[in-house]
Amino acid sequence: MAGFPGKEAGPPGGWRKCQEDESPENERHENFYAEIDDFAPSVLTPTGSDSGAGEEDDDGLYQVPTHWPPLMAPTGLSGERVPCRTQAAVTSNTGNSPGSRHTSCPFTLPRGAQPPAPAHQKPTAPTPKPRSRECGPSKTPDPFSWFRKTSCTEGGADSTSRSFMYQKGFEEGLAGLGLDDKSDCESEDESNFRRPSSHSALKQKNGGKGKPSGLFEHLAAHGREFSKLSKHAAQLKRLSGSVMNVLNLDDAQDTRQAKAQRKESTRVPIVIHLTNHVPVIKPACSLFLEGAPGVGKTTMLNHLKAVFGDLTIVVPEPMRYWTHVYENAIKAMHKNVTRARHGREDTSAEVLACQMKFTTPFRVLASRKRSLLVTESGARSVAPLDCWILHDRHLLSASVVFPLMLLRSQLLSYSDFIQVLATFTADPGDTIVWMKLNVEENMRRLKKRGRKHESGLDAGYLKSVNDAYHAVYCAWLLTQYFAPEDIVKVCAGLTTITTVCHQSHTPIIRSGVAEKLYKNSIYSVLKEVIQPYRADAVLLEVCLAFTRTLAYLQFVLVDLSEFQDDLPGCWTEIYMQALKNPAIRSQFFDWAGLSKVISDFERGNRD
């Protein structure tokens, strides 16, 4: 279109352009342009018939736009910011001089490009300043320093009119995050980030209602937040859940904590992926130490582990699972026992929940141990060189002994007692070592141990626990002489234990002894429990399964009163009974796999 300013000069009626180019072709014409410029007017004017001379500029074709949006300058090859077109360059093209609007380019320049230089002036590239002068050698480089030194931050109506709506939306976003220009993240040593002085002038110009100084000022404020938060990443805690979480703020201490937390969370126990290992088959005898609290089970296990070393696998009591996983079941149980709220349904429900939690680790570990048993090798009698698998308690205590004690104390209802009893399982080869101790000595050891949750236990509690063990032991003796079906018939009231003795073709035990065992056993309690519903098949099946499972066990009795502080002598007694009893047998296990599994259970118990 003819007459458009900034267009190349054509024939003698077009525009004449006096801009020097740095290309090699125009270098030889340098003197020629200088001679012509000596005779040319200071202001370029259009010539010829297409000049439009004498016409009024009503349509605004020659008016330079005044609301150019500021452009972000690209990054140069050296990594420094190339200054962009500033507001000063824009306002210089909008002066009152009629020729000034023709000396610069009215169209939008590409990013990083410079407006045409006036005559007699060779355009020069901007000299970038080193960052060390702006932010100091020990401070974090400021990404907005290149912009603060331009005239765009000087304010003015033209510099804020187009970007005001963007800036207002940005203000609302910062307000939603609890951030503003006077954020608490700003410190005294950041005095170079103050608001430009033109803001007060603009506020006075608008009658006290000053507009914000533009979008880039708020970006600079955002840079202050970024700089401060990068030094104090702990303040991100109050910004949790907001868009500020996308910032990648590095802090040495937080990084170490994150790595430690990630390492802890990704550590998977070997029991989950025990697949690629070389099995080592060894014969081992499984012993389960049982007894009242404080008799010395843990002390004995620690002694045997130190003596036998790799020939022994010690399975500790799962105390951490009982006390630190979800609720503290030990504390809740002792609280119900000491309060003695007998015969209440809510108490029975709480006790049932605790007992079910006590049974979980034993059932899980028994299942895992069963998977590592080499059944093809069978079982054999205990030999002197066999290994030992020593457990701190058996599932028998959690599902039979202590529930029986709680049932007799009226802390557990009949229905809840049946629920716990149904969880009892045992494997052939499990040997129970019942460590008995008189109540006085047991109470002394319990107080010496000094556990807080055991402070409310008294001698009556220990006596009731010993009675429960005795009842289970008497029931086990009955399973060694009578068939499980006959014992269940006695519990259902279909016959008596004396009749069963007389009907036996080869009586092994006298009827008087059998009657005494029955009265002291758990079966006398079971008869009372199932009597109202003795025709129910489920109750009878629970009793039958319990009797059959109980017959799998073997018992070793040790009176600790005879071995006062004599751990080697106590172990000798246990060892000799295991060798003499042909029913106590060793089984073949994958010793390497079992060691890894138990080590993970033991590690979890220590954490």
UniProtKB/Swiss-Prot annotation:
Which residue stretches belong to region Disordered?
1-160, 180-215
Bias regions of kind Basic and acidic residues — which residues?
A: 17-32
Keyword list, A-Z: ATP-binding, DNA synthesis, Early protein, Host nucleus, Kinase, Nucleotide-binding, Transferase, Virion, Virion tegument
Q: What class of enzyme is it?
A: transferase
What is a biological process (GO) this protein takes part in? DNA biosynthetic process
As recorded in UniProt, its EC number(s) are: 2.7.1.21
Q: What subcellular locations does the record give?
A: Virion tegument; Host nucleus
Reactions this protein catalyses = thymidine + ATP = dTMP + ADP + H(+)
Molecular function in Gene Ontology: ATP binding; thymidine kinase activity
Instruction: Specify where it is mainly localized.
Output: virion
Residues at which substrate binds = 355, 451
- InterPro entries linked: Deoxyribonucleoside_kinase (IPR050566), Herpes_TK (IPR001889), Herpes_TK_C (IPR013672), P-loop_NTPase (IPR027417)
Subunit structure as annotated in this protein's UniProt entry: Homodimer.
Protein name in the entry: Thymidine kinase
